[in-house]
């Protein structure tokens, strides 16, 4: 996922850090996880809703924190093949509607997907609003199937399995 020139401050600051690391001339590997699945574990679920500033049909690639840790361990174990690379990772991808349906099945009660108007988010936090606007317009573009095939050692969690693990 290219994070340069997105207009999203917290993406662009990460890009600057990555460029600085590359310019230091030291060995490095950069792991670029997508949106964290754990971001969905908010108080809204207790109120039977999943609310995000994305349309219900927008596909959002997501990473489980467990998978980020497992992939990081793999990078540390193998070392050399990963040096000098940036690897973007994602565990799964679902729409808001799909996520709400899966969460409903796991929790045993109806979770309604609510699309928060982006204007409301802009009023509260422009940086976050820009990020969600970008997610709405630009897919992160990770080839999840190829990633998982290339690194089968990672116990990649589909959203449904992640939800069962976290919510039961």
Label each residue range with its predicted role.
Residues 118-168:
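A hydrophobic C-terminal alpha-helical subdomain
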Residues 2-112, 121-128:
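Oxidoreductase cofactor-interface core, primarily capturing Rossmann-like NAD(P)-dependent enzymes
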Residues 115:
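Conserved residues in the N-terminal Rossmann fold of short-chain dehydrogenase/reductase
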């Amino acid at each position: 996922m290219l994070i340069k020139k997105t207009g999203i401050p917290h993406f662009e600051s990460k890009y600057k850090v990555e460029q600085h690391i590359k310019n230091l001339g030291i060995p490095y590997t950069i792991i670029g996880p997508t949106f964290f699945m754990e971001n969905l574990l908010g108080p809204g679920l207790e109120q039977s809703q999943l609310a995000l500033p994305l349309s219900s049909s927008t596909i959002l690639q997501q990473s489980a924190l467990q998978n980020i840790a497992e992939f990081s361990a793999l990078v540390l174990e193998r070392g050399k093949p990963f040096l000098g690379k940036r690897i973007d990772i994602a565990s799964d991808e679902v729409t808001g509607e799909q996520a709400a349906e899966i969460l409903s099945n796991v929790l045993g009660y109806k979770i309604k997907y609510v699309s928060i108007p982006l204007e409301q988010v802009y009023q509260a936090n422009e940086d976050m609003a820009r990020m969600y606007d970008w997610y709405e317009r630009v897919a992160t573009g990770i080839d999840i199937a190829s990633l998982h095939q290339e690194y089968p050692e990672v116990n990649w969690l589909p959203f449904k399995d992640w939800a069962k693990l976290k919510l039961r």
